[in-house]
Amino acid sequence: METQVRSGFVQSRLPWLIAAAALVVYGLSLNRWASLSSLPNVTGVAARELTPPISEPVRFLLFLPFRCLPVAWQPAGLNLFAAVCAALTLGLLARSVALLPQDRTREQRQRERSEHSLLSIPAAWAPPLFATLVCGLQLSFWEHATAATGEMLDLLFFAYVVRCLLEFRIDQRESWLTRSALVYG
């Protein structure tokens, strides 16, 4: 019973806690103005033409509400959006790592009787936490998380597709594959 409670925490609550902690950390270190790497997105939002681009239509639609902000607030708003995308990406990474099959050898399969080969030891929280720390504290990830370069949105979509595939492995519902195909494009 205690193992189920612990694994339920690792698979359901821990990703949200990691995402919230990442949002606080990235929010505290948020770039308040446009950086050189975020300049194309900031100028695209600040421009008053509403012609949708041929490439990246989802990014255009998601950045559209930022046009309502005053011009001085647009860079900070876009940077906050990038921080939210980064936090959600780390939450999806934690959930995906928790869903990965852990036991591979025959001896491990005999010892571990869980239905989907999920890690159920007392330290099952360590792999998702370690994965998100390694990814979230990497300099390039941090730079894109605190400035609106657009990379975090792409990475969020990729992380969601991976999560959908791992969720499909667990419960075999085709809705996960449909979501994956929809997000992948």
Identify the meaning behind each predicted range.
Residues 80-117, 157-167:
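Transmembrane-helix motifs of polytopic, lipid-linked glycan transferases
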Residues 132, 177-185:
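Membrane-interface alpha helices of multi-pass inner-membrane proteins
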Residues 61, 65, 96-99, 144, ...:
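A residue-level signal for alpha-helical anchor/packing sites in multi-pass solute transporters
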Residues 72-79, 111-121, 128-154:
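Aromatic- and kink-enriched transmembrane "portal" helix at the membrane-lumen/periplasm boundary
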Residues 24-42, 146:
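Helix-to-loop transition at the C-terminal end of transmembrane segments
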Residues 46, 50-76, 80-84, 91:
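Short hydrophobic/aromatic helix or loop-helix immediately within or flanking a transmembrane segment
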Residues 122, 158-179:
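Membrane-interface transmembrane helices that cradle and orient dolichyl/undecaprenyl
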Residues 1-25, 88-91, 115-129:
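Start-transfer (signal-anchor) and selected internal transmembrane alpha helices
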